[in-house]
Curated annotation (Swiss-Prot):
Disulfide bonds join C48-C79, C146-C158. Belongs to the herpesviridae glycoprotein L (gL) family. Alphaherpesvirinae gL subfamily. GO terms for biological process: fusion of virus membrane with host plasma membrane; symbiont entry into host cell. Residues 23-148 are annotated as: Interaction with gH. GO terms for cellular component: host cell Golgi apparatus; host cell plasma membrane; membrane; viral envelope; virion membrane. Keywords: Disulfide bond, Fusion of virus membrane with host cell membrane, Fusion of virus membrane with host membrane, Glycoprotein, Host cell membrane, Host Golgi apparatus, Host membrane, Membrane, Signal, Viral envelope protein, Viral penetration into host cytoplasm, Virion, Virus entry into host cell. Residues 1-21 form the signal peptide. The heterodimer glycoprotein H-glycoprotein L is required for the fusion of viral and plasma membranes leading to virus entry into the host cell. Acts as a functional inhibitor of gH and maintains gH in an inhibited form. Upon binding to host integrins, gL dissociates from gH leading to activation of the viral fusion glycoproteins gB and gH. Pfam families: Herpes_UL1. Its main location: virion. This is Envelope glycoprotein L. InterPro entries: Herpes_gL_N (IPR007923), Herpes_gL_N_sf (IPR038311), HSV_GL_alphagamma (IPR034708).
Length: 159
């Protein structure tokens, strides 16, 4: 199981991200923000979004086809709210996304693929493990109020 957690921390290669397009709900906001980074390894050293939220530049990637321009996906599980970052090598930009929508979409995409393989199976096991102990929840922006561990991420003040 430790290898699965490590797998979620690495950058998923372009071949995986192109093969498994993300299924997204049309009315759910996907992108939280963007930051120019010269190398993908710098994503791991960035502090969690909730600790530096106001210092970022927010925008969706200015690309027409995400799956063709996308170089990789980074999942940071050490943050209070897991972070999913899309990396665009050509633009040297990292885009932070709604982790619940992105992970759920990636798991659905990988699950619908009928091919088998070691990488696919390990990825599917790791992604499905995220949802094992979770209760069903909405992927919409939370209502006003306190969100534990993410008060600054959702611009809430926990009292």
């Amino acid at each position: 199981m430790a290898s699965h957690k490590w797998l979620l921390q690495i950058v998923f290669l372009k071949t995986i991200t192109i093969a498994y397009c993300l299924h997204l709900q049309d009315d759910t906001p996907l992108f939280f923000g963007a930051k120019p980074l010269s190398d993908v390894s710098l994503i791991i050293t960035e502090p969690c979004v909730s600790s530096v939220y106001e210092a970022w530049d927010y925008a969706a990637p200015p690309v027409s086809n995400l799956s063709e321009a996308l170089s990789g996906i980074v999942v940071k599980t050490k943050c209070p709210v897991p972070e999913v970052i899309l990396w665009f090598k050509d633009k040297q930009m990292a885009y932070w996304t709604n982790p619940y929508v992105t992970l759920k979409g990636l798991a659905q995409s990988v699950g619908e693929e009928h091919k088998s393989g070691d990488i696919r199976d390990a990825l599917l096991d790791a992604l499905s493990g995220v949802w094992v102990d979770s209760t069903p929840s909405s992927t919409n922006i939370p209502e006003n109020g306190c969100v534990w561990g993410a008060d600054r991420l959702f611009q809430r003040v926990c009292q």
